[in-house]
Structure formats: C-alpha cells, structure tokens
C-alpha cells in the first residue's frame, strides 16, 4: 500500500497528494472510487473528466434544484423554495453564485428544456419539468496520471483511497451488447416529416433523436471503465444525481468560460463511422470531407455558433479557428470547428451559456424553429440528453459538456439516445444509419448490474 501522511482537511482545503501507481489507469481508479465512496453508501456523486484529470465530487452538502415552476435550495435538511418567471439563466446563476461564496466548485447537469425559454416555448413544458440540478459536494478527489489529490475529504475517505490502491482495481465482467437497429419510434418517418417541413421553409436544420431501450439494469461505473477504453471524448462523465444515473463520452463543448473571460464552443456537425479498420476509416474520412451535405451542415452550424458568440462577446473578438477539421470520437468521426470570443463586460458565464444553449449541433437552425420542431417531432422530453454536464468555479469559470453518447437510468428504465442533423438533402435511411453509428459508441460496452 502507498504510504503517505494523513491529515483531516476542511472544506476547500487539500491534503498531501498520493502518487498513482503506474499500473493503475486513472479512469479505472476514479470510477472505482465512485463505487467505494458513493455508490455503496447510496450517495449522489458526479465524476467529470477534463483535460487529463478526473474530478470526483462526492456527497451533497447543498443542492440547487431548478424546475420549470420552482427553484429549491436544499441545505442542512432545510428546503428554501422560490417561484420564478422569466429566463432560467439568471435564476440558476444567482443560486450558484451564492453557494460559491462558501466553496470553490459546484457540479451538476442542465436539461435540454432549460434552453426552450430563450425562444418563448416554455408553455410547451409539463408542470414541474426538471431544468437543472447543481450541488456543492462534501468532498472532491482529483485523479491524474501521476497522483490523487483530496479536497475537503475526511481521514476515513483518505484511508478508503489508500485501500483501493492497496487492493487494486477489480477486473471487469463481460459486456452485454444491445442491438442498435430496432426502430420502434418510426424514426425514418419523423425524418421524412422534418425534410418536408424544411423544404416548405419552416427551418433549415433540425436534430431529431431516437431512444434505444436497454432490457437490463446497467452497472454504470463498470460500463464507464470499459467504454472509456474505446472512446476519445472531449469530456466524459459518470453521475448519480437528481434521480438520474448517467454515463457518457461527450464529443464537444457547449461552452467553456475561462476565468479570464475567454469563451469557447466547439460545434461538431457532419458524421461518418470510425473504428472499422484503417482502409474503411480513410474512405469514410475522404467521403466526410468531400460530401456536400455534410459540409453544408457543418458550415451553417459554425455560422450559427459564431452569431451566438458575437451576442455575448466583446465586439470584434468572436472568431472561428481550426475550421472544419476531422475529429475522431469513438465509433464516429466528425467535422469540427472551434469558435471563441472574449466575454463582454456586461455579460457573465450564464449569459454565455444561455446564448450557446442548447448546442446548435443538438437542436437546429435557426434554433427557434429547430427547438420548436424537436418539441413536436422528437421522441418525448429530452431531459439530460443534449443538455450539459457542468462544472462551475468561484473564479468565474464554467465548463459545460454536451450530453451525448450516453446511457441513462430513471424511474427503473434504462436507455441510450442518439440523433442526426436533418437538412433538405437528408434521406431517412442515411440519418437512421447515423444514429446507429453514434449508438455504437456505447451499445457494445454495457455491463449488466449484478
């Protein structure tokens, strides 16, 4: 067992780091710590991978629950309730800022439906629709390839970490793959309806999705470990929060706001399969880079993101960089671009999030028409799907990963969900095939819960 000194730390402080043995994968360790520290105790938690580190937020010291008709802040067994109206961004932002007066980071998720208010479509939501869950954790553990750092954790939890290192991370059971080609939601027919509406001039693009029910309960931490080995996400996450379990491998950022005010979003649009051998991957890439439908889809998405960035950025700072390069994400490859700007002096991170949310690559163009079409044509409320998993910091930073390529569990049901961007040139069969390609990011790697 690794030997280090042990000390009790207060919330926000840190204890001496623990070296990570070279034979232990940091993603495996972080997921196993989620099991040992939270799953077995029935605690809520969120694991978030960003830039070579895995941040595990465990236990709830305070919780912000934003619904379509009420804001609740729960702390020390006391619930403060507030009815609200208007935009959800300022309401959520104010609640977040209050908690960040006492701690340095909060974690949570934001539902797709958070974004309908910007377009005046909130009357379409059912009463009590969940919009966001954000919490102040009791403890936080950061795992990198070199070390483990504990923040606000007790001596007992440090001992648990040392125990996992001493025992080693357990092996994984075999996966139980699910068939991605079933289509009980008549996805092809919905695509055809959208193409007809686009041809009639109602909007230019919409992302329609379909659900794939999983016929068994999923072991989410084990699935995270196995699928992470087969994916190359920009962010990944594992969570049990607000009545939802989820595991996912985010292909893109909805928004990242740095402490110095730089805002970044990374729209991915245009898709082909990946991971089918070097020759097939090269052929698919060549087709992706030359296909007029995919190029048009990407270009109009980037233009929309640039316009949104300009709304909240200092004049002249909104720019596109790394335009239309191929980015590999597990079982698929995409055309991707980076859009950035410097946050205007009259705006804050929630203004940036509201301007960019929901992601253009998960909604439509124009967004108002795309979101309205989704509420009519898509397969039920989206919830966390195409929303965001977020990390918010006291220094003004925000990191919001687009919630795609994920598995979900709620009310005893488990499912995957994937979509495709529909434009006038779309064909139902190809868009269905694209959803199959995206579902294959996770479908082969599901491990059943024992």
UniProtKB/Swiss-Prot annotation:
Its cofactor is Mg(2+). The active site is at 252 (proton donor). It holds the Pfam family Chorismate_bind. Mg(2+) binds at residues 297, 431, 434. GO terms for molecular function: chorismate mutase activity; isochorismate pyruvate lyase activity; isochorismate synthase activity; magnesium ion binding; oxo-acid-lyase activity. It comes from the Bacteria. Keywords: Isomerase, Lyase, Magnesium, Metal-binding. GO terms for biological process: catechol-containing siderophore biosynthetic process; L-tryptophan biosynthetic process; salicylic acid biosynthetic process. It catalyses: chorismate = isochorismate; isochorismate = salicylate + pyruvate; chorismate = prephenate. Gene3D superfamilies: Anthranilate synthase. InterPro entries: ADC_synthase, Anth_synth_I-like, Chorismate_C, Salicylate_synthase. Belongs to the anthranilate synthase component I family. Salicylate synthase subfamily. PANTHER family: AMINOBENZOATE/ANTHRANILATE SYNTHASE (PTHR11236), ISOCHORISMATE SYNTHASE MENF (PTHR11236:SF48). This is Salicylate synthase.
């Amino acid at each position: 067992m690794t030997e280090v000194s042990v000390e009790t730390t207060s919330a926000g402080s840190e204890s001496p780091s623990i070296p990570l043995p070279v034979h232990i994968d940091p993603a495996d360790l972080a997921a196993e710590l989620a099991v040992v520290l939270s799953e077995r105790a029935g605690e809520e938690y969120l694991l978030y991978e960003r830039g070579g580190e895995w941040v595990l937020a465990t236990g709830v010291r305070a919780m912000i629950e934003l619904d379509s008709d009420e804001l609740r802040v729960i702390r020390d067994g006391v619930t403060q309730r507030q009815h609200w109206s208007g935009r959800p961004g300022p309401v959520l932002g104010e609640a977040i800022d209050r908690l960040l007066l006492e701690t340095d980071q909060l974690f949570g998720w934001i539902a797709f439906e958070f974004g309908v208010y910007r377009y005046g479509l909130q009357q379409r939501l059912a009463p009590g629709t969940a919009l966001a869950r954000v919490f102040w954790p009791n403890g936080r553990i950061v795992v990198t390839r070199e070390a483990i750092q504990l923040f606000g954790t007790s001596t007992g939890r440090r001992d648990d970490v040392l125990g996992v290192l001493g025992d080693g991370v357990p092996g994984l059971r075999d996966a139980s793959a699910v068939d991605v080609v079933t289509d009980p939601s008549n996805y092809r027919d919905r695509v055809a309806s959208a193409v007809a509406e686009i041809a009639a001039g109602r909007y230019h693009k919409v992302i329609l999705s379909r659900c794939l029910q999983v016929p068994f309960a999923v072991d989410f931490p084990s699935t995270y470990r196995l699928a992470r080995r087969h994916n190359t996400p920009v962010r990944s996450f594992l969570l049990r929060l607000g009545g939802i379990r989820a595991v996912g491998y985010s292909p893109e950022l909805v928004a990242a706001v740095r402490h110095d005010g730089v805002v970044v979003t990374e729209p991915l649009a245009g898709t082909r399969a990946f991971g089918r051998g070097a020759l097939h991957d090269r052929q698919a890439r060549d087709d992706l880079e030359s296909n007029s439908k995919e190029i048009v889809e990407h270009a109009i998405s980037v233009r929309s993101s640039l316009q949104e960035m300009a709304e909240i950025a200092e004049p002249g700072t909104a720019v596109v960089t790394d335009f239309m390069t191929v980015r590999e994400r597990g079982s698929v490859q995409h055309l991707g671009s980076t859009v950035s700007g410097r946050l205007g002096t009259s705006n804050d991170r929630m203004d940036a999030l509201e301007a960019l949310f929901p992601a253009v690559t998960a909604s439509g163009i124009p967004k108002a028409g795309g979101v309205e079409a989704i509420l009519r044509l898509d397969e039920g409320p989206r919830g966390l799907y195409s929303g965001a998993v977020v990390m918010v910091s006291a220094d003004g930073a925000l990191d919001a990963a687009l919630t795609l390529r994920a598995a979900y569990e709620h009310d005893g049901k488990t499912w995957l969900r994937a979509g495709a961007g529909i434009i006038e040139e779309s064909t139902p069969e190809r868009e269905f095939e694209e959803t199959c390609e995206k579902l294959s990011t996770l479908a082969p790697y599901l491990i059943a819960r024992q």
